[in-house]
Amino acid sequence: MARWEPLLEQVMRERAPRLLAYAAMLTGDDTEAHDVLQDALVRSFSRGRRFDHVNQAEAYVRRAIPSVVIDRSRKFRPVPRDPADHPHVAAPASDRDAVMDVRTALRELSPRERACIVLRFYDDLTVSQIADHLGLADGTVKRYLSDASARLAALLGADVDLREENTVPVTAPLAKGRR
């Protein structure tokens, strides 16, 4: 057995549910989340990287997930031609006014907008950290966050306010050495 295999097994046994939930938040689809997690694991463990601890391996896989989501979105996907295939366009006004849950609303964003929103409000990263993480300019990240916030506010209702001063992190600070 290769040196990395026990660590991969430990990541899958202990950390997979958390990583899968994170991938599902970014993809909006449980099946695609499984594929994204698998791709992120392959990227993380196939390049001969040496991880000293399961926390380090999990952090690397977690960091790879948004990149995998964006890369997968670049692949060809058929574009529906029938307006009925666009529920956000073809739905009657009463349906559009119904409250949507956050996961459904996130699906309406582009992959990059979704990644920026999740990294900002779920992972509590700063704009510059998101830019470094995704390989984008700070201004580009700000634009994605602005566009996505406006879209989410429209989808979730007028009383949703994603301005910085009105948000709180959804994750508690981790104790040193734990992740």
Where would I find each of the regions flagged by the language model?
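A short, charge-rich alpha-helical start-of-domain segment used by transcription regulators
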Residues: 1-21, 31
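Acidic, proline/glycine-rich intrinsically disordered inter-domain spacer in sigma factors
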Residues: 6, 10, 78-79, 83-107
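Short, small-hydrophobic-rich alpha-helical interface motif
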Residues: 19, 23, 33-44, 130, ...
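Helix-turn-helix DNA-binding motif, specifically the short coil turn and the N-cap/start of the second
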Residues: 29, 110, 126, 135-140
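Structural recognition of an alpha-helix C-terminal capping motif at a helix-to-coil junction
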Residues: 35-42, 46, 55-67
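Arg/Lys-rich amphipathic alpha helix in sigma70-family domain 2
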Residues: 46, 52, 63-84, 95
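DNA-recognition helix of helix-turn-helix
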Residues: 66, 70, 134-162, 170
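A short pre-motif secondary-structure segment
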Residues: 116-120
